[in-house]
Amino acid sequence: MTRPRHSTGIPKLDDALGGGLIPGTLTVVMGATGIGKTQLGVRYAHTGATQDGQTGVIFDLTTRGDSQNQSEYAQRMCGWKLRERQFSGHFDPASVWSPELARSDYLHAFTRGGRRVTIGDMQPEEWQEFKADLMRRLDQTIAGFYGNFVHGVRRCVIDGVEPTNQDADSFQFHLFDYLYHQVLRKEHDWLARDLFRVHFRSQEQLVQQHAYNCDTISGMFLYTSHEVMLEDLISRPIRSGDILSNANTIILLGKVRDGARIGRALYVAKHRGSACSEEILPYRIVDQGLAFE
């Protein structure tokens, strides 16, 4: 049975996508910093409240620089106060069964300590330290996603990814690759095994009571590019191992030149399994997010 499309919360964009995004797939939204990716992602996540019964979850991979302003955008655009999951030294995996403890809208696994995201920029000891830090936080990251999924969340937005020359050089892409294949796309009971480990048998009945279909969970990856102009994004080649090669849908946001004026426009470069518009769609950034002309 065909599942209803996931609305982006932007009618003009839904029309360009043939009715919306296909549930259970990965969408990459690509564009330079400041072009409107985060606002599009926040709108998409919030639309889950009306369509799925639960708002989506935003996973922030920022490790340096300023915040992506997700909380401010959510409050201003949607009147939505993001519930942030707090990462602590110790936690009880069984807390995922409590909506009050498990439901969150914003996960930020790493502090903004100025750590560079490119593996080649790290000293060997820094890379080893990072991997150890990642393993310490991985259980709580899995609990953050699983605790949302068992309570009805079906949309995930990944933000805060810095541009690199090669995706394989960035630990952010390595982490996303793990999360997408080993968390978002994993059967619910196998993900529960990863979380509860030796205690899985004692939790198995609750795991089955909270079963969900991982094929209904969609991911939106906000990809910061070096390219600023939409024309350059459209002509950008897809490299071997590039995240774009595995995405079901690619949405490009970039600057366009119109005489003496520079504006913004969107183009759906790929939408596998669906009809989509071939138009370049001009838009503006307003208080409520992306406004199409």
Predicted regions and their residues:
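Pre-Walker A adenine-sensing motif
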Residues: S7-L21
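Walker A/P-loop NTP-binding active-site region of P-loop NTPases
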Residues: G20-D92
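NTP-binding/hydrolysis catalytic cores, primarily Walker-type P-loop NTPases
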Residues: P23, F130-L134, S277-E293
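Short acidic, S/G/P-rich loop/turn micro-motifs used as interaction or catalytic elements
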Residues: I35, E162-A168, V228-E231
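Conserved inter-motif catalytic segment of the P-loop NTP-binding fold
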Residues: D60-N165
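Conserved ATPase-coupling elements of RecA-like P-loop NTPase cores
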Residues: T164-L175, E187
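Charged helix-capping and loop-helix junction motifs
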Residues: F171-Y178, S235-G241
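Phosphate-binding/switch region of NTP-binding enzymes
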Residues: H188, A192-G289
